[in-house]
Amino acid sequence: SLVGSEMCIRDRYSDDKFIIMSTANGTIKKTNLQAFSRPRSVGLRAVDLAEGDYLVGTAIVDGTKDIMLLSSEGKAVRFKETDVRSMGRTAKGVRGMRLDPEHKIISMLIPSEGGLLLAVCQNGFGKRTELKEFPTKGRGGKGMIAIQTSERNGPLVGATQLFAGDEIMLISDQGTMVRTRGDEVSIVGRNTQGVLIIRLKENEKLVRIARISEPSEDDPETSEDGTNAVSYTHLTLPTNT
């Protein structure tokens, strides 16, 4: 098994908290946090994955959140957490987003007040967009355009939620790493191409982005996106456990 996602837990496995999980093939799953309260040295099965599928995102939710999934096609779907019923650890989950065979989910977000969507494509172009431009609809659809994946841009390779003061790290397939302030990325509309964020060499491709959050003065261990820190739970790709 490979570690697919890692999160921090401070809610002491409360029965009113859930782990929401999304996979590359568009599956979404919600499981009560208490189901993971007794970890084993070999790990616990978190989701039953189809062959070739893998985990792309996890978060802790409380029954009141919205969920956003973003695909390599540059599309996004936003739906209420209550559209996903709670199910056991070994269940497969339900369809979160309908994808064409050549596309994958690349990110899952839990929209928060004050957050902006950062979307960056393979050729180094990207943008920030107000989350209010993405209305809440039912799960399972093909989604709406979050960024144009034109020939200039290439496919969407990274998406995250940014807050004031955050920085971002951009990483290419040739090992180039650029750190920049998120506030310097242009805020533009949903159905646009964005602007150049990182200049790449010929045949060089952007492969990953990472958000570097501004610590909170009140609680430096608390993230804006629901992954609060105290102890760690590792969700691994399932074994025969």
Give the location of each predicted region.
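Short, small-residue-biased leader/transition segments that mark boundaries at the very start
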Residues: 1-9, 236-239
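Acidic, low-complexity intrinsically disordered tails
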Residues: 213-235
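Conserved structured catalytic cores and adjacent interaction surfaces
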Residues: 6, 10-144, 153-177
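Positively charged
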Residues: 72, 97-101, 144-152, 197-217
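Intrinsically disordered, low-complexity regulatory regions of eukaryotic regulatory proteins
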Residues: 9, 202, 222-223
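Short alpha-helical interface patches
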Residues: 82-85, 183-186, 240-241
